[in-house]
Amino acid sequence: FQAEDGIRDSSTSRGLGDVYKRQNINIKHLCGNSSVGKHVKFYDKSLSKYKLPKILKFNKKLLKDVHIIFTALPNGEAQDISKHLSKNHTLIDLAADFRLEKASDYLKWYKQKHRATNLIKKSIYLLPEINRKEIKKYNIISCPGCYPTSILLPLFPLFKKNLIKLNNIIIDSKSGYSGAGRGVHKKYKDKNLYESLSAYGVGFHRHNSEIDQMLRKFTKKKFQFSFTPHLSPMFRGILSTIYVDLENKISQTKVLKTLISFYKNESFVKILKSGTLLSTNDVINTNNCYISCLLYTSPSPRDVEESRMPSSA
């Protein structure tokens, strides 16, 4: 595990605990920067019950006796680590270094040049419920962003089965403030995070690039969506409400049956009864994504999908 400043963010801490519980995985090294020499329990007391090594400064020599490397670093840093991988290594990156398929798109959205362009083709943007079968072909796995996960899971089946009109998709997403990173309190120092709901990145949020890239894989038709993210007064969680117009003769029942069929064998995606209203609290401290389907009848028939995720990436 290589993480910025130890294990301070919820996705890294949760991921470390989940990996430790796997009987066939042995955590060899934990790496950080200013946290070198400390125990992870200093940052997260819930990790005290696990026998974990002290945090080290990353050195490429540490890669000799490991097979899988998890990185949760500022954008750009996993690119440097990726240069030291052998054919026997698998890198799983929680940041955005390998989410985009074109180096030019990475420069456009992240305002920095990609430093491992030759490895982009050796990486995959992996959302297991959608493209799990591709995983064995690549040794660099890029985990999707939090917003795109909550958006792509509901939309994928509808795109693939041509159930919705593609010219007016409205995505309204709300995230807990942990998703804004460790510097959230400095960044929003003039706002009360606990008493405020704020839109941000309207029209140019970086996750637009991921959503657009993946939706293009689902259809050859032209499509248009508007995505508005919000920072909400909760620590973690994602609530995405997606408004779509149904194609002619497509019913809410058809949409629901399609979703159920697509995810019937997926343990982390749960499709609920039509009309069910949810809250992020329904999935807190789980790895689940709940999807609910509602019909909006005024002023025109419109299908509303809601998805809930427990944590931010």
Question: Model segments located where?
Answer:
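Predominant activation on well-ordered alpha-helical scaffold segments within soluble catalytic domains
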Residues: 152-159, 208-212, 256, 260, ...
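Oxyanion-binding "anion nests"
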Residues: 208, 212-227
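Short gly/pro-enriched beta-turn/loop segments at secondary-structure junctions
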Residues: 164, 195, 206, 220, ...
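Conserved active-site and cofactor/substrate-binding residues in soluble primary-metabolism enzymes
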Residues: 122, 149-153, 202-210, 254, ...
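C-terminal active-site/capping subdomain that shapes the small-molecule cofactor and substrate pocket
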Residues: 243-248, 252-298, 302
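Active-site-proximal loop/hinge segments within enzyme catalytic domains
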Residues: 186-189, 221-245
